[in-house]
Amino acid sequence: MPKNQICQRVEALRQFMDKHGLDAFVFPSSDPHNGEYVPSHWKTREWISGFNGSAGTAVVTRGRAALWTDSRYFLAAEEQLQETPFALMRERIPGTPSVAEWLSEEIGTGGRVGVDGWVFSIAEEHALREELAFHGLDLVLAEDPAETLWEERPAIPQAPVCLHPIAYAGKSAADKIKDLRERLQARHVEATLVCKLDEVAWLANIRGTDVHCCPLVVAYMWVTQQKAVLYVDDAKLDDTVRKALLEQGIECRPYGSLVQDLPVCGVQSVLLDVNSTNSRLGELLPEACKIVSGGSLIAPEKAVKNETEINGFRNAMYRDGIAMVKFLHWLLPAVKTGDQTELSVSRKLEEFRAMQPLYKGLSFDTIAGYAAHGAIVHYEADEKSDCELLPKGLLLLDSGAQYQDGTTDITRTIALGTLTEQERIDYTLVLRGHIRLAMVRFPAGSTGTQLDVCARYAMWQQGVNYL
């Protein structure tokens, strides 16, 4: 992306801020459904900053701009933010201020900080509002500046909705909704709004391609004791899918109708998952409706897999293993022959996977990092960075696939030929860390941070570490 475009967008945003009486604007990495993976339409943080990592927060004031991200993306962010107005803020590194701390220094007491409430969950908005207030700053739910400033903004995805057969789901949508209603009744709540796309897909037994590398549909679901409504754009439904959903007790209404329906929902109480329901939707419920804040009612049920799902996972792993072994058999001779690059081997691995039954696509963009590129967390080769593979050194390969009966993710570090002594040492130290971590016994309640010591111990003994 041309760096001058970022500068122009930041200046246009500052004019927007002047017009709306804002001293700063905050762009998170989320969408109205607060999922981990975001359709292009809502990638406003990437649009304003040029940084395309999956995690990060961009903040623009009238005079400065900064981007916060974690250690996975330090190297990528350093490169992508060069020659832009954005300074890199390294999260969880001593001395790095929080967004609120930085803003308190930049705009001072009484400053107005704008956010788009459609992409902040109720919990996130509440937490940021409190932290800003502690520093004497006000949080303002503003319009989405990208709505007017983002030229050629991608549309909200319109891919067709597909049914997920019970042969792979193991349980009908009608039965899942029945169980959800029982849980609502046990909580003495009349209704719930399901916002997370993976939870909507699981509950309604539907799949789609609205999110890159994820079989998801952009939709909401409203469930009461009397009805279940799937809010999804009409263009995505054919008659067969609509009829099948109706047979499961699911009515379909246009995606945008939720905004009109919530204020007249006619229930006295609703349970909202404050971590996935966006702030704007929470505001739309009528004042007489009691909002019961809580966690998701779907996630615990979705996490307990039935026998059909478990068998599906096993079968998917088996087929994916076949594809991986075929690829590994092909790889070394191909590298010795020459003309193989990070991108070419990624494509070849995808070819082997596509030969397997029930293959639907990649589960994420393949990470093929050769030599120094293997040290860049979440590295993604492109035409500019792509490099030739030689019959020496290490290739990091992190890849996976979506099958109709399961999802896979496998990482391997492959020696393409002769290794240097240091490469052997580093590989062995990492392997020892894996073994130590796999063998450790730990008490319930232990944290990942505590167990991380086991993974790093062998390296620390040799005076090396990783971020």
What are these regions (language model features)?
Residues M1-L467:
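Active-site neighborhoods and metal-handling regions in enzymes and metal-associated proteins
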